[in-house]
Curated annotation (Swiss-Prot):
Changing D89G: In less than 10% of the chains. Disulfide bonds join C40-C86. Inhibition of trypsin. Changing K120Q: In less than 10% of the chains. This is Trypsin inhibitor DE5 alpha chain. The record marks R64, I65 as: Reactive bond for trypsin. Keywords: Disulfide bond, Protease inhibitor, Serine protease inhibitor. Changing L4F: In less than 10% of the chains. PANTHER family: KUNITZ TRYPSIN INHIBITOR 2 (PTHR33107), TRYPSIN INHIBITOR A (PTHR33107:SF81).
Length: 138
């Protein structure tokens, strides 16, 4: 079964989408922020302002298919027009840090060393699920 965007269209493999909460009043879309002692915004966070759609994210799956279904493992990568200079050498692909389980932006050296995500139906909406490499994620 294919997944649908907010306009009722199938999610395209390699397509760019804003990831926002299913319900109003729960904050905005996903964006990057500095957390802890970071000098560069590498942490994926939810925008506090409901009006913010966040950053567009490209959803891609290795099989050359046209549309994405819930069974496919995805890479998620922000598509920021003008990334901060500290991120210019990164592809803005998401990773989950093992110890803290926080979603971060991977550096070039880390690109192939982490799991992937799936989009799963949840009630009348969808949720992102992280898949460890040994679970089938890359």
């Amino acid at each position: 079964r294919e997944l649908l965007d907010v306009d009722g269209n199938f999610l395209r493999n390699g397509g760019s989408y804003y990831i926002v909460p299913a319900f109003r009043g729960k904050g905005g879309g996903l964006e990057l922020a500095r957390t802890g002692s970071e000098t560069c915004p590498r942490t994926v966070v939810q925008a506090p302002a409901e009006q913010s759609r966040g950053l567009p994210a490209r959803l891609s799956t290795p099989p050359r298919i046209r549309y994405i279904g819930p069974e496919f493992y995805l890479t998620i990568e922000f598509e920021e027009q003008k990334p901060p200079s500290c991120l210019r050498d990164s592809n803005l692909q998401w990773k989950v840090e093992e110890e803290s389980q926080i979603v971060k932006i991977a550096s070039k050296e880390e690109e192939q060393l982490f799991g992937s995500f799936q989009i799963k139906p949840y009630r009348d909406d969808y949720k992102l699920v992280y898949c460890e490499p040994q679970q089938g994620g890359r």
